[in-house]
């Protein structure tokens, strides 16, 4: 029954699943890392699974994986109409953002140059969706209940009246142009006593690298290709 339901979801309901997965596989071999985000879209009223390029996922230096990273930022781009619909649905705060501000990265500009096209004005908002462990006293109780296994070390006493400061997982969405916070949400299951963060991202790696991101064909054979080109030019000269 579960298999039948999942097949129905992926083939009939989630129409974007196959093309997004194929885009991810193509990018994976070149870049070495690719991501997919699985979440509930209020505009579509269903689950979606979208491909995310490696350059749109930002993690702290030294992070080893998504599960243990203290902060993961997804750079999103949404049209004004999409943001308005999410505000109307109560997913984002109903605040005035003005007109979208064009924002491009060095990677996007270089990719456009290599592909032979120019970047025109992009009438979309750039949003930073930050999945991070935060201490928000305005939302959480000052004296939090300690999850199982998170007590004080042996021989360590907490001062009387001192609040227990434990960062908990949240999702904070920020509009890049104005710096406006659109949403702050808890990112753990209410029934989870450990308050572990819910995982919305899947990281695919082509060849494991020395850090968080994997190595692709560009990294593996790129150096040999440049060396071969240099040798040929020297022989011709």
Residue ranges of predicted features:
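Extended alpha-helical, oligomerization-prone segments that build pores/tubes and scaffolds
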Residues: 1-237
């Amino acid at each position: 029954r579960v298999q039948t339901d999942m097949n129905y979801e992926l083939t009939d309901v989630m129409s974007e699943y196959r093309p997004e997965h194929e885009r991810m596989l193509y990018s994976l071999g070149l870049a070495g890392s690719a991501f997919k985000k699985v979440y509930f879209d209020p505009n579509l009223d269903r689950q979606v699974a979208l491909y995310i390029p490696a350059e749109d996922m930002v993690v702290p230096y030294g992070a080893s994986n998504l599960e243990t990273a203290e902060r993961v930022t997804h750079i999103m781009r949404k049209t004004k109409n999409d943001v308005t619909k999410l505000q109307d649905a109560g997913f984002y705060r109903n605040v005035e953002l003005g007109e979208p501000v064009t924002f491009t990265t060095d990677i996007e500009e270089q990719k456009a140059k290599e592909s032979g096209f120019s970047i025109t004005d992009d009438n979309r908002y750039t949003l930073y969706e930050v999945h991070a462990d935060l201490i928000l006293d305005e939302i959480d109780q000052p004296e939090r209940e300690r999850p199982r296994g998170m007590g004080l070390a042996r021989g360590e006493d907490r001062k009387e009246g001192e609040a227990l400061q434990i960062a908990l997982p949240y999702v904070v969405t920020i509009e890049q142009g104005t710096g406006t916070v659109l949403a702050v949400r808890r990112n753990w299951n209410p029934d989870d006593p450990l308050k572990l963060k819910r995982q919305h991202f899947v990281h695919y790696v082509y060849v494991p690298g020395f850090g968080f991101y994997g190595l692709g064909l560009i990294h593996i054979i790129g150096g040999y290709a440049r060396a071969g080109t240099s040798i040929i030019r020297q022989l011709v000269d």
